UniProtKB/Swiss-Prot annotation:
Free-text function comment from the UniProt entry: Component of the biogenesis of lysosome-related organelles complex-1 (BLOC-1), a complex involved in endosomal cargo sorting.
Protein name (database record): Biogenesis of lysosome-related organelles complex 1 subunit BLS1
Assembly with partners or alone: Component of the biogenesis of lysosome-related organelles complex-1 (BLOC-1).
Keyword Transport: yes
Keywords assigned by UniProt, alphabetized: Endosome, Transport
Subcellular location: Endosome
Gene Ontology annotations for the cellular component aspect, listed alphabetically: BLOC-1 complex; endosome
Similarity annotation: Belongs to the BLOC1S1 family.
Membrane-spanning segments: none
């Protein structure tokens, strides 16, 4: 049996040893890989996803909005024109009624 000082020295060596065992090395590599994935690859993936979302969803919707905003403006003009036509028809109808009244009184 080793003397207690030798035993103490071995225990100190084991406890204070900072070199990694094979499982410790594997665990460190996994941690480093996880950090790389979160710091680098996840940012790239989010940027790619954002760009893909913009191209597939936002841009087509923006184009539709721009296209149909023009139609909406024209339909607003159509509403005004319809109101003017309706007013003109009422004036014509009233004029016809007045003409018919004048004919019947003569």
């Amino acid at each position: 049996m080793p003397p207690s000082t030798e035993l103490d020295a071995l225990v100190d060596k084991i406890v204070n040893d900072h070199s990694l065992s094979e499982p410790g090395q594997s665990l460190k590599e996994l941690g480093d890989n996880g950090k790389y994935i979160m710091d680098v690859q996840m940012k790239k993936l989010l940027k790619l996803h954002d760009q893909s979302f913009i191209e597939r969803c936002f841009t087509p919707m923006e184009e539709l909005k721009n296209r149909y905003a023009k139609v909406k403006e024209r339909s607003g003009d159509l509403q005004k024109e319809a109101e003017l036509v309706d007013r003109d028809i009422r004036i014509i109808e009233m004029a016809i009624q007045d003409i018919n009244k004048n004919k019947s009184h003569q």
